[in-house]
Regions:
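Post-cleavage N-terminal segment of exported redox proteins
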Residues: 2-60, 87, 97-162, 188, ...
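C-terminal cap of thioredoxin/glutaredoxin-like
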Residues: 166, 173, 181-187, 199-211, ...
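Short Cys/His-rich "knuckle" micro-motifs
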Residues: 88-91, 189-193
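N-terminal, post-signal-peptide region of Sec/Tat-exported proteins
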Residues: 49-80
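Short acidic alpha-helical/loop segments enriched in Asp/Glu that coordinate divalent cations
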Residues: 150-153, 177-180, 192-196
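The canonical Cys-X-X-Cys-His
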Residues: 74-86, 136, 164, 175-186, ...
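Conserved short C-terminal alpha-helix that flanks the catalytic cleft of nucleotide-sugar-dependent
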Residues: 67, 167-168
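Short cysteine/histidine-rich metal-coordination sites, predominantly Zn2+-binding motifs
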Residues: 93-102, 195-204
Length: 263
């Protein structure tokens, strides 16, 4: 079954012209960058634009409740330290992943939330890709909606950005493709009826209609890696955080959209 699926996907890629490009990919120029929103149909755009119709906003509302709820042995809520998220969290998600000095490596926003739970609330971490973590992340990220992505400038991050870029450019898996072959070289094409976008992470966590739920950027990355029939990574793996870091640096200056809606 896996072999047959691989052949089918390879055939779709050939039909789309995705494997008929030069071996050396070309990075997208700044002036050509486009949010995934611009590739969507009018109904999907309208759903994202209207907060009363955007299903991702339900998750963000749940996140607001979690923000104000006391948790852990310390009996603290996020609001006890950070106050009103609409002020204190403005622009925060636009800077993540960020460097964590005690760990000596970058952490994404979900990991920062769980580190805060452990360090300050003395609470158990939220499991990856479960509703509570996605909802609280969406609520925090929503406070940066409309603000430009502004990656953490810490010099300590630069080696990790380089690792993320190497991952994005490197061909891998049974299909022998890199992220760049689809998202730099072929973003003007379609694959299985869906547009191939430029992979700018402007709206995560997103509400994806295919999933019928909120989902993280790492969920999307893992889906892509599975599609290449390549070795995958656990949620929170350093390799995925490094890739997130590179993608955010690649999207520098683009406006945040969380919670975005995608097909």
């Amino acid at each position: 079954m896996k072999f047959g699926t691989t052949i089918l996907l390879a055939s779709l890629l050939v039909t789309a012209g995705i494997v008929l490009r030069p071996l050396i990919a070309t990075e997208i120029q700044s002036a050509e960058r486009r949010s995934g929103y611009t590739f969507m149909g009018p109904e999907t755009k309208a759903m994202q634009d209207d907060d009363t119709a955007n299903p991702g906003m339900l998750g963000a509302l749940d996140g607001e409740a979690l923000w104000n709820r006391k948790a852990g042995a310390a009996g603290k809520a996020c609001a006890d330290c950070h106050g009103d998220a609409r002020a204190s969290m403005k622009g925060v998600a636009a800077r993540y992943p960020a460097y964590d000095k005690p760990l000596g490596r970058p952490v994404n926003l979900e990991q920062r939330i769980n580190l805060c739970r452990a360090r300050h609330q003395e609470a158990d971490p939220f499991p990856y890709e479960k509703h509570d973590l996605l909802a609280l992340t969406a609520f925090v990220a929503e406070q940066s909606r409309g603000m430009p992505i502004a990656p953490d400038p810490s010099p300590e991050l630069q080696p990790f950005v380089a690792k993320g870029r190497d991952f994005f450019m490197h061909r891998q898996g049974q299909l022998n493709l890199g992220c760049t072959n689809c998202h730099d070289d072929n973003w003007d094409k379609h694959l299985a009826g869906s547009p191939v976008t430029q992979a700018h992470p402007t709206g995560y966590p997103i509400y994806r209609l295919e999933w019928q739920s909120l989902g993280s950027l790492q969920r999307r990355l893992r889906n892509c890696i599975n599609g290449l029939r390549a070795q995958n990574f656990d949620f929170g793996a350093p390799e995925l955080v490094e890739l997130e870091l590179y993608l955010m640096s690649r999207a520098r200056g683009m406006p945040m959209e969380t919670p975005a809606v995608r097909p």
